[in-house]
Amino acid sequence: MAEEEEVEEGRSSSSAILDLPEPLLLHILSFLTDVRSRHRAALACGRMRAAERATRSELSLRGDPRSPGFLFLSHAFRFPALEHLDLSLVSPWGHPLLSSVPPCGGGGGGAPSASSSSGMNVYHPEAISEQNAFIAARLAGCFPAVTSLAVYCRDPTTLANLTPHWQASLRRVKLVRWHQRPPTLPDGADLEPLLETCAALRELDLSEFYCWTEDVVRALTTHPSATAALTHLDLGLAAATDGFKSSELGPIAASCPNLRKLVAPCLFNPRFSDCVGDDALLSLATSCPRLTVLRLSEPFEAAANIQREEAAITVAGLVAFFAALPALEDFTMDLQHNVLEAAPAMEALARRCPRIKFLTLGSFQGLCKASWLHLDGVAVCGGLESLYMKNCQDLTDASLAAIGRGCRRLAKFGIHGCDLVTSAGIRRLAFTLRPTLKEVTVLHCRLLHTAECLTALSPIRDRIESLEINCVWNTTEQPCSVANGTTTECDPEDDELGEVYESAAKKCRYMEFDDLGSWEMLRSLSLWFSAGQLLSPLISAGLDSCPVLEEISIKVEGDCRTCPRPAPRTIFGLSDLAGFPVLAKMKLDLSEAVGYALTAPTGQMDLSLWERFYLHGIESLQTLYELDYWPPQDKDVHHRSLTLPAVGLIQRCVGLRKLFIHGTTHEHFMTFFLSIPNLRDMQLREDYYPAPENDLMFTEMRAESWLRFEVQLNSRQIDD
């Protein structure tokens, strides 16, 4: 009887919302944006499930849409209002969604799609073609109103089958490919099906799509009617090492006269005769006068090869360039070569582009000299809300003071590689911009150690929401115990600044008396470490109280082979992050930490021991909900795989619900993760270039192995 009474009470409590008219119920449900909240509502009853499907506007598929479980769903499985569909993360990740390549060749990837969709191997090209058409039609039937599509494309077959079903509505497309471009593919063939079919296309995103610059130029110039309608074009090109030349940038701009957003890597190296210079920039501005967002960057060059020569861009050329773009709001020019005496160009930017709000500059010298009381250079851009300056060697504390006086609306500020800036300049800027500044980035500035930087940010400690810094510990200011990976209180007798503090409350010398408050609004924290450095000193350096910190990103770079072997019982220090009470998301990126994947020489540690060093203590993060992990690599053998110590440590994170490994691993290692009680969403992503081409040769994890693990994962009973 008691159970029946509880059921009746539950029905009466839910009847209030279920008795609402259908339009009002749909309107209420449309306000639920959190995915899990919508899922909970959909599980309540059939009417709520139908309402959730009717109002869902975006969806990212993680499973295998080629499997019988999806292909033979009831026709009631339909999302009539869904506009954004992401197919770039379908399982197994990186394998062709639709492919005409027989699975028996060395191209890899065909076997999983054929076997997973029909339960038997289909080798005949006609059978594969029919299968592709059926899968594409099933997707179009489930999601009839798609206007924005993201998809992983190993070859043009996927687009050739999908785009005809949404050709009238498709306005935005993002292509993803981290594998090598098929060498026999004609130039521009990857984009051919898209530009030929989708007349309504307005936005094209290739920021994570590896291809050649020749492909882009050929595709855009041979379809003038389609490209003339484009308003947003992102040509970031995943892992691009070469940018667009002057002879390529001009035709692209001429083919897309209505662009409002353009992102492109360019060749600015003056040693090349076809580099982008003043004439190319002016031609770009003349061809696309409506640009509001323009982001041009020079692909990263190795330090051994780079020489800080002058770029082929002059101040006079920039002045003419800005004069031709009056609507510009967001401008990025991140160069590896110097532009000298850039202050007049920045003043022209403020004068000619009055709407400018977001500005990112790399290797621009003389941005703000601040030699007199009047403002000069970038400081006259009073409408800026975001400013990021990189490798500006003559930027000083006085420059920051002038920027603080002139740019009073700044909410985001960042410097990278500015070696003359000190903590005094950062503190003065923070004090001046206290009412507006919310996000700060300080990276690789020679005179700014981490503790000094945190101290300098004390004026906005209670207001800042996002912080990105590189961790450089001043060993002369650390106790020996901190340098060895442990933390203890400082000895008051060792503090040379005793006259500043009260003797009963002395702190470490990098802690100021007015820095005892908490980081009340800090929600996102990004940390950069060189290989072998410790996280442990971070807490005692000033980041001890972050009550609302939700997300942390840790990036480690360097050659572990040159690092001394850590002392016994010395660990990186992830357990220190357990003091953040609501930490839910972590990105731990060791992809640029290089070591020995196989047997290491005497006295050195292989990658498995380095993974143990960095991951030890991660089980202490009881609130951790989502983890993205990039394993370290051995570039000599192109090895980026999860080792047994890493698997054993990660599987002890009992609170994890989402786990994404950006690398490979062995199938029997995956069974460890089944012991994580609430793990619901997991994926192996080889989203780095070049991703392994052939599962049978270069990766430990086969597609069939992953699908078997996925069945085990999805068959578990999740408590919540």
Swiss-Prot record:
Changing R36W: In d3; dwarf and high tillering phenotypes. It holds the Pfam family F-box-like. One of its GO terms (cellular component) is nucleus. SMART domains: LRR_CC (SM00367). Expressed in leaves. Expressed in roots, culms, leaf blades, leaf sheaths, shoot bases and panicles. Disruption phenotype: Increased number of tillers and reduced plant height. PANTHER family: F-BOX_LRR-REPEAT MAX2 HOMOLOG, PARTNER OF PAIRED, ISOFORM B-RELATED. Associates to a SCF (SKP1-CUL1-F-box protein) E3 ubiquitin-protein ligase complex. Interacts with D14 in a strigolactone-dependent manner. Interacts with SKP1, SKP5 and SKP20. Involved in strigolactone (SL) signaling. Required for responses to SLs and the establishment of arbuscular mycorrhiza symbiosis in rice. Strigolactone-dependent association of D3 with D14 and D53 (a repressor of SL signaling) triggers D53 ubiquitination and degradation. Controls tillering by suppressing axillary bud activity. Tiller is a specialized grain-bearing branch that is formed on the unelongated basal internode and grows independently of the mother stem (culm) by means of its own adventitious roots. This is F-box/LRR-repeat MAX2 homolog. It comes from Oryza sativa subsp. japonica (Rice). The gene is D3.
